[in-house]
Amino acid sequence: MVASFDDPTLEAFRHASGHSVSTSAAVGETRNLVILSRLGLDRLASPKSQGLQIPVAKYGYALDFPRLVHSAHQRNMAIHYWTINDPAEMQRLIRLGADGLITDRPDIMRETLRRLGYPEIETPER
């Protein structure tokens, strides 16, 4: 999945790739889906991307609410939150339905997943 914060850059990439590569929503597309979801008008959203990669909050507004996760999933979009380093926050977002978490602490993530009953992940040797 290719991601960029810049809408024109992402749109140029989509065009250059013939829309054959999955992309994450840029700022404008993310903002539209978040606002429409908050207003209960998410049925009007028609994002071009296959995912959201977002923080849990921005400018004091929560982005980790159930309707946004549901709206993304209804559109076959993955939703990834960044940067999550706290085990309780990891657990909460997994239970919310996040498809991925970006973390600086894979050791904590691994232990959190183990505690939630996920199968052990083998670490490749270096």
Regions found by a protein language model. Give the residues of each.
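Short loop-to-alpha-helix "cap/lid" segments that border enzyme active sites
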Residues: M1-D99, T103-R126
